[in-house]
């Protein structure tokens, strides 16, 4: 192993000084499409790495029974259930659609291990999430509502597992059309183990009832199975404890919300649940903000790192966990923070003020890689002291944060092309890429100089028109799995593969092998360890199991792992 490590080091020395100036050499592996028949129902919830080299992919497809648009197609073939009949989503009749989840376990070679889906309840894809768990399964945190009389106003979700077994999750206190959250624990075979309900308070306001009163924007899991939710709420939140009682979180800024679901108001929150989904502890801000959100979160080394957005309110001072929050009142400021996972005590809170005529920022990715936190998203303006954007459009950004101090040590924004966004980065040694989209080009892979974050010339991985949607990619050794939405025709880079003839828009997820990626081993003395070896990320996610140490570390991306109960750095 030492000889291999030295050889790889020599190879890196011979590599070009700036990877960002080199056209990325990528090789197509495989691709899949998920396609419903409605015009706006196909979207991505997320994808995560699972055990044994597999991954979980959660998408949504729309149904409208009035237009006979209730079925689903995968790779152009109609999807059937365990009984051999075509699967059918929730009934719905109207001008929009009902969102149904399609959950798949996929091997790293692209073969489908199993399918599961929902057929009651309207899933909000953009505020729902999946995250893998230590036991090889996953959590699905779903924002859902019962709004269809034919499906039953008390049926939040009906989950159909890979064997065809149906579980209906009811909420007798639900108000028709009210969004609530369900935390679902799903086993590695796709069966549903348990569900927990998180509800809010519905009140009559100027523009209607407060039925969209909370949103979860980020989810993380620690090595003990503890669950962390970040987001925004606007009335009250009710979370169940192990003793059967309910914890109530009360928002401070409630009077300014008129009930409009698109209103930019409310309070930020961080909620800790135990491994069984019961409430443990929470963190909210002290003082009143005009609006406050916690967005993406990642767990590492006993701490939570997250970003957010916060806008001040005249005459009000803000603190988070006793730490002062410096914030302006004219726009949402970018918030970066560190919190202890054990007791939710705050290590630091940093804010960065946007600059320019347009200052909106979207936070879409948060990754722990090689001892740093990488944030990605889009920004309409610049960020004070980091980068400028005078284009007046959303442009993809990357921030590299030192987790010890909260300081942004490097930053980048891509000003080329049209409206754009980054969802995440790939880093292995000196090889780095950013994945996102450009609405004038498609889904992009942009080479990045790992030392400076300078951006190279992008290639278009997927040409699909002007529809923009995606999620943080899966990093699987030297392979990367990405997803985006497209119209009914798309082509992929470096292959003759394409899809045509889909009903309307479709989701496509696909895998590429990235060139120039190699793995070296450092800071471990367990090289010759024999027997079954499990590999975990520092947030407790099982990456894979192997029959020897050498097989366990083979193919791992750069980063810090727990291998055989020891912390190991892959360089």
Positions of PLM-derived features:
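A sequence-level/structural motif corresponding to short, flexible coil/turn segments enriched
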Residues: 21-518
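Cross-kingdom Sec-pathway N-terminal secretion signals
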Residues: 5-6, 20
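Bacterial N-terminal signal peptides
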Residues: 7-15
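Positively charged n-region of N-terminal signal peptides that target proteins for export
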Residues: 1-4, 571
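C-terminal outer-membrane/trafficking sorting elements
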Residues: 520-571
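Glycine-centered signal
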Residues: 15-17, 236, 562
């Amino acid at each position: 192993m030492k000889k291999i490590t030295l050889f790889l080091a020599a190879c890196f020395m011979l590599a070009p000084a700036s990877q960002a100036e080199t056209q990325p050499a990528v090789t197509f592996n495989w691709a899949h499409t998920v396609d419903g028949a409605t015009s706006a129902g196909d979207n991505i919830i997320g994808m995560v790495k699972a055990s044994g080299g597999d991954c979980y992919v959660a998408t949504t497809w729309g149904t409208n029974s009035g237009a006979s648009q209730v079925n689903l197609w995968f790779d152009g073939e109609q999807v059937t259930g365990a009984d051999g009949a075509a699967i059918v989503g929730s009934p719905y009749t109207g001008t929009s659609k009902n969102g149904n989840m399609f959950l798949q376990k996929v091997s790293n070679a692209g073969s489908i291990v199993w399918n599961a889906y929902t057929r009651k309840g309207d899933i909000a894809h953009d505020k729902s999430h999946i995250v893998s768990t230590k036991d090889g399964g996953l959590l699905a945190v779903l924002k859902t509502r019962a709004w269809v009389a034919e499906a039953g106003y008390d049926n939040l979700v009906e989950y159909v597992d890979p064997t065809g077994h149906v579980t209906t999750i009811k909420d007798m206190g639900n108000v028709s059309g009210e969004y609530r959250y369900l935390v679902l624990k799903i086993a590695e075979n796709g069966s549903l183990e348990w569900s927990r309900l998180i509800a809010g308070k519905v009140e009559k306001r100027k523009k209607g009832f407060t039925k969209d009163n909370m949103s979860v924007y980020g989810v993380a899991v620690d090595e003990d199975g503890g669950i962390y939710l970040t987001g925004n709420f606007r009335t009250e939140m009710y979370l169940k404890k192990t003793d059967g009682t309910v914890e109530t979180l009360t928002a401070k800024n409630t009077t300014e919300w008129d009930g409009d679901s698109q209103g930019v108001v409310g309070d930020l929150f961080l909620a800790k649940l135990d491994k069984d989904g019961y409430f443990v502890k929470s963190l909210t801000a002290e003082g009143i903000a005009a609006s406050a959100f916690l967005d993406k979160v990642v767990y590492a080394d006993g701490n939570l790192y997250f970003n957010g957005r916060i806008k001040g309110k005249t005459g009000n001072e803000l603190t988070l966990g006793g730490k002062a929050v410096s914030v302006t009142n004219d726009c949402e400021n970018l918030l970066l923070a560190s919190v202890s996972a054990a007791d939710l005590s705050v290590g630091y809170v940093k804010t960065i003020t946007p600059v320019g005529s347009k200052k909106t920022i979207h936070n879409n990715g948060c990754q722990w890689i090689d001892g740093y936190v990488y944030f990605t998203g889009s920004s309409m303006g610049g960020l004070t002291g980091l980068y400028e954007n005078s284009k007046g459009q959303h442009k993809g950004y990357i921030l590299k944060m030192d987790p010890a101090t909260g300081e942004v040590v490097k930053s980048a924004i891509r000003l080329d092309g049209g409206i754009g966004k980054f969802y995440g980065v790939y880093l292995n040694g000196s090889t780095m890429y950013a994945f996102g989209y450009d609405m004038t080009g498609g889904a992009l892979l942009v080479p990045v100089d790992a030392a400076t974050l300078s951006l190279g010339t992008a290639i278009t991985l997927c040409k699909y028109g002007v529809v923009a949607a995606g999620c943080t990619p899966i990093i699987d050794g030297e392979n990367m799995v990405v997803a985006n939405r497209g119209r009914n025709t798309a082509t992929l880079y470096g292959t003759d593969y394409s899809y045509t003839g889909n009903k309307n828009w479709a989701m496509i997820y696909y895998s590429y092998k990235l060139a120039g990626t190699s793995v070296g081993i450092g800071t471990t003395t367990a090289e010759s360890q024999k027997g079954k070896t499990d590999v975990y990320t520092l947030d407790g996610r099982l990456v894979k199991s192997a029959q020897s140490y050498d097989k366990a570390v083979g193919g791992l991306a750069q980063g810090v792992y727990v291998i055989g109960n020891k912390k190991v750095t892959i360089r």
